[in-house]
Amino acid sequence: MGNQSFKTLSIDDFLQITGWPDFSKLIKKEHDKVLAVQLPGTFVNFSKPQNSLKNRYNEIPCWDHSRVILIPPSAKYNYDHTDPSHITLTPTEIPSTYIHANFVNGFKEKRKFICCQTPKKNTCEHFWRMVLEQESHIIVSLTKTDKGGFVCHEYWLNAEEGMEIFGRYVIRTLEIIKESSFTKTRLRLTDVCTDASREIHHFWYTDWPDVGNPISPVQILDLILQMNKKRKELTQAAGFKLGPIVVPAPKESVEQEYFVP
């Protein structure tokens, strides 16, 4: 490793060490050292009191240097959920640009992904605002949803012809396709205040264990291949580069680190 705290080993040296009786202890000791390294950067916006309820976990910061900055709304919009066309405008309390989400580079492509925490009940509107503002067309969810929103609030309706409304954003479910290990869904995202609308392709993988990695890496590889294929198709049809792929995960850690190439 390149850090002064760690010794760089050749392949032969490493293979020799694997035969030592205390090999596992050495690995754990080095792992603890890695975790103890203080990362450079600030997370001022994450720490602001007005943003605390938007964060799912206090111990996982949102770094300032790569965070997604929302465009602050000029007004707050309230809707009659039985009639999305019924709009009430009120002055916004505090224009907010914060969402727990960061740009992440892909292989040979800068800002290919946005890795974010799974939406909470009070951040679903911010989530869809981010998707629309960033010109994103693909979402890859790596976790199950739950009605209580403890892991991930249901930010779309998993039923054809279903509809969810979060603030000014209406999300309609157009089509659901069941694959062998994940579900593909076509959604229609609409901002009822500006009439901006976009079709969203949602990939949903729900077999990630609570601890560890997926049992079948082939399933994840298939998901990545289909995701990249769809993105290529959409890019060719649009004639311009699409926005980042949005990847929500509960703790923005294990799942995203494993998935994001």
UniProtKB/Swiss-Prot annotation:
Residues 26-261 form the Tyrosine-protein phosphatase domain. SUPFAM superfamilies: (Phosphotyrosine protein) phosphatases II (SSF52799). GO terms for molecular function: protein tyrosine phosphatase activity. Coiled coil: none annotated. Disulfide bonds: none annotated. Belongs to the protein-tyrosine phosphatase family. This is Tyrosine phosphatase-like protein H5. It comes from Microplitis demolitor bracovirus (isolate Webb). The lineage of its organism: Viruses, Viruses incertae sedis, Polydnaviriformidae, Bracoviriform, Microplitis demolitor bracovirus. The gene is H6.
